[in-house]
C-alpha cells in the first residue's frame, strides 16, 4: 500500500527524509479521508442532515487531493495548510450549523494542530492551535449572545456524539502511529 502512496509523490521529495515522511503521512491521511467521507456523508443523510453531508463531501474532496498538489509542485507546507485549512473550515461550519461549542463535532478541532504537528512540526501546530483557540473563543461569545442556533438533540445528537468519539479516538491513534513511524525513520536516517 505504501508503494502506491509513494508513486503519487514527486521523487524530488526523497532528498529530504523529513519532507518525504511528511508527504507520506499526508498521503495516508488523504487516503483515510477518501475512505471515511462517503460513510460520513451517508450517515448525515440518514440523520436528515444533508447540508452537513455535502459540506463534509466538499471539504473531503479538498483534503483528498492534497497529495496530488505535491506532484503539481506545491511545497509540503502549502499542501499541509490546504489539508488542515479544509479540516478547520469544515469544523467551523459544523460548529456554527450544529449548535456552537455544544455541537457533537466540536472536539474534532483538536485534529487541526495534531495534523499540523505531524506534517510540519511544532511551529505549524502552535499556529493552528492559536487559530483554533481564537475560534473556540469566538464560538463561545456567539453562543453566549444567542447568535447561534440551539444544539442538536435527540437521536441525531446521540449518534453524532458516539460517531465523533469513536472517530476521534481512531484518528488520534492513527496520528500517534504515524508520528511514531516518522520518529523511527528519522532515527534510522541519522
Briefly describe each language-model feature range.
Residues 146-156:
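Membrane-interface helix termini and inter-helical loops of multi-pass transporters
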Amino acid at each position: 500500500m505504501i508503494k502506491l502512496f509513494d508513486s503519487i509523490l514527486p521523487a524530488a521529495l526523497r532528498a529530504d527524509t523529513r519532507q518525504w515522511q511528511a508527504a507520506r503521512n499526508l498521503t495516508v491521511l488523504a487516503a483515510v479521508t477518501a475512505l471515511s467521507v462517503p460513510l460520513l456523508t451517508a450517515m448525515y443523510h440518514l440523520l436528515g442532515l444533508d447540508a452537513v453531508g455535502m459540506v463534509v463531501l466538499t471539504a473531503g474532496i479538498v483534503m483528498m487531493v492534497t497529495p496530488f498538489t505535491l506532484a503539481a509542485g506545491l511545497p509540503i507546507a502549502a499542501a499541509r495548510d490546504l489539508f488542515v485549512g479544509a479540516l478547520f473550515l469544515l469544523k467551523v461550519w459544523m460548529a456554527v450549523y450544529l449548535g456552537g461549542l455544544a455541537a457533537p463535532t466540536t472536539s474534532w478541532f483538536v485534529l487541526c494542530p495534531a495534523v499540523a504537528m505531524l506534517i510540519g512540526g511544532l511551529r505549524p501546530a502552535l499556529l493552528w492551535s492559536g487559530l483554533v483557540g481564537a475560534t473556540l473563543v469566538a464560538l463561545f461569545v456567539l453562543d453566549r449572545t444567542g447568535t447561534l442556533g440551539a444544539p442538536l438533540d435527540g437521536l441525531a445528537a446521540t449518534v453524532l456524539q458516539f460517531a465523533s468519539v469513536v472517530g476521534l479516538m481512531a484518528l488520534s491513534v492513527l496520528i500517534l502511529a504515524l508520528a511514531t513511524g516518522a520518529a523511527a525513520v528519522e532515527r534510522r536516517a541519522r
